[in-house]
């Protein structure tokens, strides 16, 4: 069976609230770490989310 091209990643909030999103990314085309601005409901504003490993 072939290895899947998409992997699950965890996007951790940079606001330090402990909130995170789980999403997928294509490991072959996006080799660098993902950084996205998304809404943090704990901080109640848009902050940067940085890629981390799912434990």
Swiss-Prot record:
GO terms for cellular component: cytosolic large ribosomal subunit. Keywords: Ribonucleoprotein, Ribosomal protein. InterPro entries: Ribosomal_bL33, Ribosomal_bL33_CS, Ribosomal_bL33_sf, Ribosomal_zn-bd. One of its GO terms (biological process) is translation. GO terms for molecular function: structural constituent of ribosome. SUPFAM superfamilies: Zn-binding ribosomal proteins. NCBIfam families: PRK00595.1 (NF001860), rpmG_bact (TIGR01023). Belongs to the bacterial ribosomal protein bL33 family. This is Large ribosomal subunit protein bL33. It comes from Roseobacter denitrificans (strain ATCC 33942 / OCh 114).
